[in-house]
Amino acid sequence: MRFVLPKGRLYQDSIKVLELAGIKVPKRDERALIWGDGNNEFLLARAFDVPVYVEHGIDIGIAGSDVVEERGSDVFIPLELPFGKCRLSIAVPKEKVVDPENMDGYKIATKYPNITKRYFENLNIEVEVIKLHGSIELAPRIGIADAIVDIVETGNTLRSNGLVEVAKIMDVSALLLVNRISQKMFFEEINSFITKIRRSVYGH
């Protein structure tokens, strides 16, 4: 089988979960993005690309629910995993605290333009969404945005940049993703894999 693993904060926990299910992940050469052991092949990808790889043919992947929601990829999601817990929230400068319902005309910086647009559309609030790929929390400080939508774990990064959380959009955790065709073609193998993960993680 082919597995796609996310770079960054979910990587080590993803390997642990696979190994609990009996999938041995061989040591990766530092520069290798694809590696394997003859039985399974592993691909290392940007977290935002994992659902896309799974939708388009990689058998199994692990990604945050934030990324899956943002991408809207058509994948089978059999399990929520017990790591990667955080939240996607709206934050503003601490001296300009405003509820989302009063953000009409605001510029919002985020890596999550689709989720952000949907959230404010549901509130009937018109905002301008500015897509950035990193250091989102700097946008209000340098004057290019009035607020941000970003992942919050402890809130330390927000505080150190003079920002406060004003609303939670969604809770986030890691998800197991399965390609829909693979799920049918390798039903027994994938079902056994899912069962092993569920038992090792949740005990049932």
Curated annotation (Swiss-Prot):
Cysteines paired by S-S bonds = none
- Tell me the enzyme class: transferase
- Gene Ontology BP terms: L-histidine biosynthetic process
> Where mainly found?
cytoplasm
**Alphabetic keyword roster:** Amino-acid biosynthesis, ATP-binding, Cytoplasm, Glycosyltransferase, Histidine biosynthesis, Nucleotide-binding, Transferase
Its localization reads:
Cytoplasm
For molecular function, the Gene Ontology terms on record are: ATP binding; ATP phosphoribosyltransferase activity
Report the transmembrane regions from the record: none
Q: Kindly state which reaction or reactions the protein catalyses.
A: 1-(5-phospho-beta-D-ribosyl)-ATP + diphosphate = 5-phospho-alpha-D-ribose 1-diphosphate + ATP
Question: What InterPro entries is this protein classified in?
Answer: ATP_PRibTrfase_cat, ATP_PRibTrfase_CS, ATP_PRibTrfase_HisG, ATP_PRibTrfase_HisG_short
List the GO cellular component terms: cytoplasm
Q: Where on the tree of life does the source sit, at the highest rank?
A: Archaea
What are the EC numbers?
Answer: 2.4.2.17
Named in its record, the pathway it takes part in is: Amino-acid biosynthesis; L-histidine biosynthesis; L-histidine from 5-phospho-alpha-D-ribose 1-diphosphate: step 1/9
Q: Which family does it belong to?
A: Belongs to the ATP phosphoribosyltransferase family. Short subfamily.
Give the PANTHER family listed for this entry.
ATP PHOSPHORIBOSYLTRANSFERASE, ATP PHOSPHORIBOSYLTRANSFERASE ATP-PRTASE
- Annotated NCBIfam families: hisG
Described purpose of this protein according to its UniProt entry: Catalyzes the condensation of ATP and 5-phosphoribose 1-diphosphate to form N'-(5'-phosphoribosyl)-ATP (PR-ATP). Has a crucial role in the pathway because the rate of histidine biosynthesis seems to be controlled primarily by regulation of HisG enzymatic activity.
Q: What is this protein called?
A: ATP phosphoribosyltransferase
Species of origin: Pyrococcus furiosus (strain ATCC 43587 / DSM 3638 / JCM 8422 / Vc1)
